[in-house]
Amino acid sequence: MEIDESKRASSDSLTIYVGELSPKTLDSDLFRVFSNVGKVLSVKLIKRAEPVSSFAFVTFENEEDAERAIREYKHYELHNRQIRVMKKDERPPETGNIFVKNLPEDFTGKDLDDAFSMFGEIVSCKVATTSHGKSKGYGFVQFKEKKAAKKVIKNFSSLDGLLLGGNRIVVELYNPEIKKGESKKTSATFTNCFIKNFPFDASEAELLELLERYGKVTSLFFPVKDNGKPKGFAFANFENHESALNAIKNLHGTFPFGAGRDGTGEAFYIQKGQRKEERAEELRKMFEQMSMQGQSYKKNLYITNIPEGFGCEELGSIFKEFGNITSISVGVDGANSQKQYAYICYSTPEEASIAVERGNEIYLDGNRLQVAYFKNKLERMKEKEFGGGLGYKPGVPYMYNQGVSFASRGFKRERNRGGAAKPYGNELEKLHSLVLAAAPSFKSQWKDFGVGNEVEFANKVIRAFRSRSEEEIKDMIDLNFVLTKNIASAIEDDNSNDQVLL
């Protein structure tokens, strides 16, 4: 059936803007979320390094679904961030924006909407949060018209602020530098310092005397062991930020107790003290920046030198100590049938980093495990081009080396005469790893699909894909949302075949 182009809605009315996205968000995530509203034709995701947020354009088949998505997903949270959803033509410049601070801790984007909707039509609003979803105490409201924002400022000035949830909030016209400045305010000024690398026999009084040469110390946390000896670290809180900076400037990297005195042998360490959540937030941002720059700080790990007899269950029980495992598969080393390898995917890069650091210390039946970040074909080609790369070990079977086979159901590469792998088989193996990683997203459909785990799921999907052209296979490898759509179609086709047989 042909569609009369004159009756088709304009592309702008079919497309919505989705902003404030986490770097963790993939186009497949957006496709899955908005497919609950209606048929999604395309997702165009624009990834940007923090602190600038990523955004996307989602195009629906009809205008009603696009409008419904804006209404129903106005305050939706994805990867611990409240996303911004609006019409494509209502994006910034943000002339109708206001900045609201001193918000109650439990205040949400919906609460902001309820509080300010009396002043005019609101396009979007959000409360800034940490990666764990905790409010930072400030937020932003964007009105459709600038005069509504000015009306808010005028009213709040005459009322000398307004009490919301017990807090007297402050409202200002949005300044692009405010958002950047607020996020850096805490790290810019501090008084608490973390200290280590002092002599084993140093006393609390001795350390305090040293620190107070540079400013008044209001408190000193100096933990000791059961035998009375110091644990080797301390926290000092100075009266003001300048004193803390002065101590760091004059003491860090020096030997204030004398180089010959019994101690760690390392220079004195004093730096800004951070709460656990602050350290986690900085680490998260570091991983996101590195990931955006194409570095191998990922969630997928490749483990080798595993003795035979250790399956997914045994390895999972060992590696779950380091974080939440989303998928795991074990394969047999083609070069040595008595050794195995595994792929493990964690829910966050931070967890994967811990597993790499500590996993290499694990011995199984006398075999020391070799744990590294999974490298795709392009990364390995670059390593080879520039001299082999760090951590490359000849003889260790990478995913595309000859002899690769999966323990479950025997998925193998196709070969040319003489043992060389066919290019098409190469692509299928790469696609297999992507389907394997996506398997947990379809867990609710495993039973109807007739599979019980990730490997069975991936193998069955790949069998369905074998009839596809090489061009289709490459599209699925390159575009997450295309892969997601094709997996869903494979499941649907399988269910349809079952109905026919019945």
Curated annotation (Swiss-Prot):
GO terms for biological process: regulation of translation. Binds the poly(A) tail of mRNA. Appears to be an important mediator of the multiple roles of the poly(A) tail in mRNA biogenesis, stability and translation. CDD domains: RRM2_RIM4_like, RRM_SF. The keyword Coiled coil does not apply. It holds the Pfam family RRM_1. One of its GO terms (molecular function) is RNA binding. Keywords: Cytoplasm, Nucleus, Repeat, RNA-binding, Translation regulation. Residues 14-90, 96-176, 191-275, 299-376 form the RRM domain. The gene is PAB1. PANTHER family: RNA BINDING PROTEIN. GO terms for cellular component: cytoplasm; nucleus. It is found in: Cytoplasm; Nucleus. SUPFAM superfamilies: RNA-binding domain, RBD (SSF54928). Belongs to the polyadenylate-binding protein type-1 family. This is Polyadenylate-binding protein, cytoplasmic and nuclear. The keyword Ligase does not apply.
